[in-house]
């Protein structure tokens, strides 16, 4: 039986114990802060990256893993003749998935590369489900089919307390940013079809609370498989959201600090709600 190994990138927000238990390989992106390059793998300590970003003169810059790194990792993982499934963040956020494809073409490994259309814990949903099926001995076709199902039943919502980082990082248009006067604006967006689509914006904390109330109303009519909550900065609002949402899903909600790659673009006091519905 051919063993299938699962690879993803460090934009995924996931519990370390799951990575170990499911034998997931995470390829780190890098972050440059005031001309010093850090591997994302070295910035996982709670609050460490946020402090570096607050102290930096310029907005940090993220870089995808080099093609050669992917090629080496793929080559190493296939030494026993197994197959590899690499699931990465949306191409709209980073060139990582394309670097993985190029790395696969340079290696002798049997690699299938998938664009998750998401990032953070929404990427985790696909990666974890794929890894579970791989451990059960399912073939590539069955795993890919299930990953597609998970993708099609996932929603990613992100709330930011400033649009400055998203605009500077080129992740939303400058026009949108200027109309919102950049600072002190709270916005909730949905990632859909590889785009961040604005849903609501306003100046006070009520912006987030009103939107959450509307989300909860919609959840009561749907079968929720799992929910993840990620945050940057204080986790107070994340915990408050968990208390409000836990009644709508059987599985415990994961509340995790998002990594440096996402924090670079969202800034401080941002959050995300990631929802996977039953097929």
Swiss-Prot record:
PROSITE patterns, per the entry: DEGV
UniProt organism field: Streptococcus pneumoniae serotype 4 (strain ATCC BAA-334 / TIGR4)
Organism superkingdom: Bacteria
Coiled coil found in the keyword field: no
One Gene Ontology MF term: lipid binding
Domain DegV: 4-277
Protein name (record): DegV domain-containing protein SP_1112
Keyword Cell membrane found: no
């Amino acid at each position: 039986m051919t063993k299938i190994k699962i690879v993803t990138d460090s934009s995924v927000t996931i519990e370390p114990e799951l990575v170990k238990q499911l034998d997931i390989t995470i390829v780190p992106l890098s972050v440059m802060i005031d001309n010093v390059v850090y591997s994302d793998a070295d910035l996982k300590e709670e609050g460490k990256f946020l402090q570096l970003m607050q102290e930096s003169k310029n907005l940090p810059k993220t870089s995808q893993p080099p093609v050669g790194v992917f090629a080496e990792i793929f080559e190493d993982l296939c030494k026993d003749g197994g197959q590899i499934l690499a699931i990465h963040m949306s191409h709209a956020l980073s060139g990582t998935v394309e670097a993985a494809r190029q790395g696969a073409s340079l290696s002798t490994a049997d690699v299938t590369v998938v664009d998750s259309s998401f990032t953070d814990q929404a990427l985790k949903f696909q990666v974890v489900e794929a890894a579970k099926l791989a451990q059960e001995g399912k073939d590539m076709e069955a795993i890919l089919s299930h990953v597609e199902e998970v993708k099609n039943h996932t929603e990613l919502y992100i709330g930011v307390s400033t649009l400055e980082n998203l605009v500077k990082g080129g992740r939303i248009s400058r026009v949108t940013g200027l109309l919102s006067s950049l600072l002190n604006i709270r916005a909730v967006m949905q990632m859909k079809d590889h785009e961040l689509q604005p849903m609501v914006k306003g100046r006070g904390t009520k912006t987030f609370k009103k939107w959450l109330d509307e989300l909860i109303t919609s959840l009561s009519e749907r079968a929720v498989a799992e929910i993840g909550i990620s945050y940057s900065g204080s986790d107070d609002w994340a915990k408050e959201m968990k208390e409000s949402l836990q009644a709508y899903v059987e599985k415990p909600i994961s509340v995790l600090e998002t990594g440096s790659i996402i924090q670079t673009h969202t800034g401080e006091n941002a959050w995300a709600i990631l929802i996977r519905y039953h097929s």
